[in-house]
UniProtKB/Swiss-Prot annotation:
Motif DEAD box: positions: 407-410
Protein name as annotated: ATP-dependent RNA helicase DDX42
Keywords of this entry: Acetylation, ATP-binding, Coiled coil, Cytoplasm, Helicase, Hydrolase, Isopeptide bond, Methylation, Nucleotide-binding, Nucleus, Phosphoprotein, RNA-binding, Ubl conjugation
All residue ranges annotated as the Helicase C-terminal domain in the record: 487-632
Gene: Ddx42
Biased composition regions of type Low complexity, renumbered to the chain: 35-52, 723-737
Positions of ATP binding: A297, K298, T299, G300, S301, G302, K303, T304
Cross-link (Glycyl lysine isopeptide (Lys-Gly) (interchain with G-Cter in SUMO2)): K894
């Protein structure tokens, strides 16, 4: 084979010019490349070894790198081929011995080689062996006698101890891990630290002057009043209600019994309520009565609406919020979800009265919540921590809060909010109305209720928080300390005959003295106090349990933890230091379903404790004697905080509002129609709020129409006769509208030489041919001749308007200018005058005739009388002008107020020019109530 055809000196290489390969040898030159495939090694090439020896090293060197690469690929490709061919079935060739063996093999012969089936077979064998062993044990146990199963077997207590030993963390509440981790600038997670919220600092309420407010709005429906005591018991039993407390209101059984107005009832019907739930039947009357309440009911019982509906009526009776005021009602709840849910209910029912609600909870935008609080909201629904944050940052305050609700108090305590809850309650005025709702009534909740509620009514719906009624409490009021001793020695034998007696004394010295005195009387007793050794205590308690000693004299060290069912009588010889200790004392009897009696001996010096005792008895449905109540009333704080009975404030259903605010769209029923100072007394009720209310404009129009019809009354005949001179001389009717001035009288006045209105009637651009004034001036000074100005009222006197033609002409020019500048208001006023003709003055024609008939006399120079009549009718003029401006500005209160000031400011001392300047910012005027 000739590899190089170029001759001597030419370069060897590949290519068409580098070598020539014969047709027979062409395949052999490619064999080395094919030999490095995945199916064979380099040595398998037969043609490579037959090539000429000189060319072998040169050719091998050229392809050395490629050979390396191919060897690597071949190594990995072998693995891929092996792995890919693992699952392929083996099919032997035709007519081969393996093929014959394959066909002769049984189909399930390889099932023994399946590892899963082998494992399952082993498990079944083990189970069979275990069953056989258990059967043998049962046979042995039956043959053996004298073994007690109740001793040998593990009982519940042993199982509990074993479980606690194996699970030391059982019962520990694991803190939930927060998924929302925060990361620093490098992307490393920041370890979450629980935010510690300090409670609000204490506050001295005696330094704050709180305005009084009304709490009681409940007027009992006559159907409920007519119920007999037995029917009342049956109704509560039917509703599955248990009520305790001092004089609880009777429950209602329908919405009509609550006395809600139509606006609230419309929202209730819209929310698809058909009848109140059991907790609402009793809770709404309690809350409407202004009483503090403990509501114990499960979730979903309707307790949210039970405190929202009375809250709306409570808010509507108070003054509107001023800038910087905090909320009137605060609802505190444990979680954000519950906060949003209650907030939605408050908005749904609050829009009936255009009340604003704000939800304040952790996780929300602090800035947005602070902004909403600063804009003003009557209702705040909050979680404790976030409310405290806002109060500390002065975004709001609790000065005006008079309705406080704690919902799901037990969950707040479980979440560790006890101190925050107490600090919020301590920051609200002490005479507030407080409602506490909980699903359970544990000791912590009971203690909180005693601390923050005053004379609460406890309403239990369902089978939660069953009160212990096995203890009967009897209070004996004695004159002095020696009377206690006489009472005890007289009754002690009787008590010991029915069971063991436990005597409680406050001080150790008194306990020892009482024990020694009783021993001298021959009574067998034991003594227990804190200075005794533990062995002595144990011996006394053991003897008392065995009934070896029937009487035990003890201090409060025995009040807690003594569980002796044989105690039938507890005697509080000295009153306890506080009501908590008293509760634990009387709890020593009436245990394990046994009945017991607790006696408490009081003297007149125990009036402080008597108040606590009254509330304790009322909370336990025990009888409170009149003597005990009289003794408690000697205490100033109890007398002040005691709930007041009597009927609630009238709700004015269908008419005016509660107290300071009227219902939207309704006229006031109780304002004084004759007093001009009260004309705008209800104006503040219609100020537009910042909330989005679709029908607010309609309500305002209806409100002003109602005000218009109620405030302006038709003139009587006596007013016409009394104001005859004024009606013609000045063009004002007795109601103060400029609706008719005769043309003839004006002309006569022009011809008369001494008429003070000689040029004014010509120059006034408001007269038309019919004699009606279409554009009325905004302010009218009183006119007098030769100083008769003094006869006008003080509000109407103007400087420099006396006698003299020059001054009269100046008045005429100024008056005309005034009319011209306020022509728009005058046109509207003219509309009001025409409305007056059709609505209030059917006899306007006769009055016009009367004015024409007496025009000469009236215009003949009776300027003094003219001034008097103008002064007398000024109040009505103000009303009529106000009416015109109301119509002009389409019931806009802001424009109304500014124009009202323009109308009413009659003390301008400017000598020349009566044009009213730009209205200043509205200040308090005499129209405000």
């Amino acid at each position: 084979m000739n590899w190089n055809k170029g001759g001597p000196g030419t370069k060897r290489g590949f290519g068409f010019g580098g070598f020539a390969i014969s047709a027979g040898k062409k395949e052999e030159a490619k064999l080395p490349q094919q030999s490095h495939s995945a199916f064979g090694a380099a040595s398998s090439s037969s043609g490579f070894g037959k090539s000429a020896p000189p060319q072998l090293p040169s050719f091998y060197k050229i392809g050395s790198k490629r050979a390396n690469f191919d060897e690597e690929n071949a190594y990995f490709e072998d693995e891929e081929e092996d792995s890919s061919n693992v699952d392929l079935p083996y099919i032997p060739a035709e007519n081969s011995p393996t093929r014959q063996q394959f066909h002769s093999k049984p189909a399930d012969s390889d099932s023994d080689d399946d590892p899963l089936e082998a494992f399952m077979a082993e498990v079944e064998d083990q189970a069979a062996r275990d069953m056989k062993r258990l059967e043998e044990k049962d046979k042995e146990r039956k043959n053996v006698k004298g073994i007690r199963d109740d001793i040998e077997e593990e009982d519940d207590q042993e199982a509990y101890f074993r479980y606690m030993a194996e699970n030391p963390t059982a019962g520990v509440v694991q803190e939930e891990e927060e998924d929302n981790l925060e990361y620093d600038s490098d992307g490393n997670p920041i370890a979450p630290s629980k935010k510690i919220i300090d409670p609000l600092p204490p506050i001295d309420h005696s330094e704050i002057d709180y305005p009084p407010f009304e709490k009681n709005f409940y007027n009992e429906h006559e159907e409920i009043t007519n119920l007999t005591p037995q029917q009342l018991i049956d109704l509560r039993h039917k509703l599955n209600l248990r009520v305790s407390g001092a004089a609880p209101p009777r429950p209602g059984s329908s919405f009509a019994h609550f006395g809600f107005d139509e606006q609230l009832m419309h929202q209730i019907r819209k929310s698809e309520y058909t009848q109140p739930t059991p907790i609402q039947c009793q809770g709404v009357p309690v809350a409407l009565s202004g009483r503090d309440m403990i509501g114990i009911a499960k979730t979903g019982s309707g307790k949210t609406a039970a405190f929202i509906w009375p809250m709306l009526i409570h808010i509507m009776d108070q003054k509107e919020l001023e800038p910087g005021d905090g909320p009137i009602a605060v609802i505190v709840c444990p979680t954000r979800e519950l906060c949003q849910q209650i907030h939605a209910e408050c908005k749904r029912f609050g829009k009936a009265y255009n009340l604003r609600s704000v939800a304040v909870y952790g996780g929300g935008s602090m800035w947005e919540q602070a902004k909403a609080l600063q804009e003003g909201a009557e209702i705040v629904v909050c979680t404790p921590g976030r409310l405290i944050d806002h109060v500390k940052k002065k975004a709001t305050n609790l000065q005006r809060v008079s309705y406080l609700v704690f919902d799901e108090a037990d969950r707040m305590f479980d979440m560790g909010f006890e101190y925050q809850v107490r600090s919020i309650a301590s920051h609200v005025r002490p005479d507030r109305q407080t409602l506490l709702f909980s699903a359970t009534f544990r000791k912590k909740i009971e203690k909180l209720a005693r601390d923050i509620l005053i004379d609460p009514i406890r309403v239990v719906q369902g089978d939660i928080g069953e009160a212990n009624e096995d203890v009967t409490q009897i209070v004996e009021i004695l004159h002095s300390g020696p009377s206690k001793w006489n009472w005890l020695t007289r009754r002690l034998v009787e008590f010991t005959s029915s069971g063991s007696v436990l005597l409680f004394v406050t001080k150790k010295a008194n306990a020892e003295e009482l024990a020694s005195n009783l021993k001298q009387e021959g009574h067998n007793l034991g003594l227990l106090h804190g200075d005794m050794d533990q062995s002595e205590r144990n011996k006394v308690i053991s003897d008392f349990k065995k009934k070896d000693i029937p009487v035990l004299v003890a201090t409060d060290v025995a009040a807690r933890g003594l569980d002796i069912p044989s105690i039938k009588t507890v005697i509080n010889y000295d009153v306890a230091r506080d009501i908590d200790t008293h509760t634990h004392r009387i709890g020593r009897t009436g245990r394990a379903g046994e009945k017991g009696v607790a006696y408490t001996l009081l003297t007149p010096k125990d009036s402080n404790f008597a108040g606590d005792l009254v509330r304790n008895l009322e909370g336990a449905n025990q009888h409170v004697s009149k003597e005990l109540l009289d003794l408690a009333m000697q205490n100033a704080w109890f007398r002040k905080s005691r709930f007041k009975g009597g009927k609630g404030k009238k709700l004015n259903i269908g008419g005016g509002g509660l107290g300071y605010r009227e219902r939207p769209g309704l006229g006031s029923e109780n304002s004084d129609r004759g007093n001009n100072n009260n004309v705008m007394s209800n104006y503040e009720a219609y100020k537009p709020s910042t909330g989005a209310m679709g029908d607010r404009l309609t309500a305002m129009k209806a409100a002003f129409q109602s005000q218009y019809k109620s405030h302006f009354v038709a003139a009587s005949l006596s007013n016409q006769k009394a104001g005859t001179s004024s009606a013609g001389a000045s063009g004002w009717t007795s109601a103060g509208s400029l609706n008719s001035v005769p043309t003839n009288s004006a002309q006569q006045g022009h011809n008369s030489p001494d008429n003070p209105m000689t040029s004014s009637t010509k120059n006034i651009p408001g007269f038309n041919n019919s004699g009606n004034i279409s554009s009325a001036p905004v302010t009218y000074p009183s006119i007098g001749a030769q100083g008769v100005n003094n006869t006008a009222s003080g509000n109407n006197s103007r400087e420099g308007i006396g006698g003299g033609n020059g001054k009269r002409e100046r008045y005429t020019e100024n008056r005309g200018g005034s009319r011209h500048s306020h022509g728009d208001g005058g046109n509207r006023h003219g509309d009001g005058g025409r409305h007056g003709d059709g609505y209030r003055y059917p006899e306007s024609g006769s009055r016009h005739t009367d004015g024409h008939r007496h025009g000469e006399t009236r215009h003949g120079g009776s300027a003094g009388r003219h001034g008097e009549s103008r002064g007398a009718n000024d109040g009505r003029n103000g009303e009529s002008r106000k009416e015109g401006f109301n119509r002009e500005n389409k019931m806009d209160p802001k424009v109304d107020s500014s124009r009202m000031d323009k109308v009413d400011s009659k003390t301008d001392k400017t000598p020349d020019g009566f044009a009213v300047p730009e209205p200043p910012k509205r200040k308090k005027s005499r129209w405000d109530s």
